[in-house]
């Protein structure tokens, strides 16, 4: 869905619009920024040069803020993008997303490869950014528990179908996390909509 919104994939059917404009139009694409798992910059480009490039394509890109984030995350600006670890590759893309200042910022699995400290820092910066520069931020993640307190509205999608679409507070009030012996848990869950299961041992 996020790739369709940002024009990277074409829908099989139907239409997608951003503020009334077709999603693949310049008017729509200029309002959107996708922080995905893939790096879209040349691999041998240095982080510093990538920030310069972002500023060209996104007029409201805050270069000084991006550099301050790089300092907080300890991301070296003179390092080539292909020399970054998985975690620091994610951090590089997160910094772009937090600094771009478009009306809509889409984060697809944003904390991939990040350790707990860097995940916490990202979530803190996400809230801070929203407070200072309100915009629509979409976070697509499997780590629901980590973002539940940050998200106002939740859409749960499985295999292309919307299972739930409601305010987060309303959804969490109607959900349970159940643990115990497998047989007892399976018995309790029978007939209920199970979102995910984890087996230990």
Locations of regions flagged by a protein language model:
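Helix-to-loop junction immediately C-terminal to a conserved catalytic motif
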Residues: 6
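Catalytic Walker B motif of ABC-type/P-loop ATPase nucleotide-binding domains
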Residues: 105-109, 114
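Conserved ABC transporter NBD signature motif
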Residues: 14-27
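Conserved H-loop
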Residues: 134-143
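ABC-family P-loop ATPase nucleotide-binding domains
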Residues: 36-93
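Helix N-cap at the start of a conserved alpha-helix in ABC-type nucleotide-binding domains
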Residues: 116-118
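ABC ATPase "signature
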Residues: 165-166
């Amino acid at each position: 869905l996020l790739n369709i919104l940002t024009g990277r994939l074409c829908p099989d059917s139907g239409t997608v619009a951003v503020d009334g404009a077709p999603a693949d139009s310049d008017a729509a694409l200029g309002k959107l920024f996708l922080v995905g798992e893939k790096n879209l910059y040349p691999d041998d480009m240095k982080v510093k040069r990538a920030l310069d490039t972002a500023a060209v394509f996104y007029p409201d890109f805050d270069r000084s803020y991006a550099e301050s984030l790089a300092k907080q995350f300890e991301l070296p600006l003179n390092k080539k993008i292909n020399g970054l670890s998985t975690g620091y590759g994610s951090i590089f893309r997160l910094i772009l997303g937090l600094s771009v200042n478009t009306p809509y910022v889409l984060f697809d699995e944003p904390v991939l490869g990040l350790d707990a400290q860097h995940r916490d820092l990202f979530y803190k910066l996400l809230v801070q950014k929203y407070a200072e520069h309100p915009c629509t931020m979409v976070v697509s993640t499997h780590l629901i528990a980590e973002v539940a307190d940050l998200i106002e509205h939740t859409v749960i999608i499985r295999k292309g179908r919307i299972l739930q679409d409601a305010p987060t507070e309303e959804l969490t009030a109607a959900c349970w996390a159940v643990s115990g012996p497998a047989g007892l848990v399976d018995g309790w869950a029978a007939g209920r909509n199970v979102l995910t299961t984890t087996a230990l041992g």
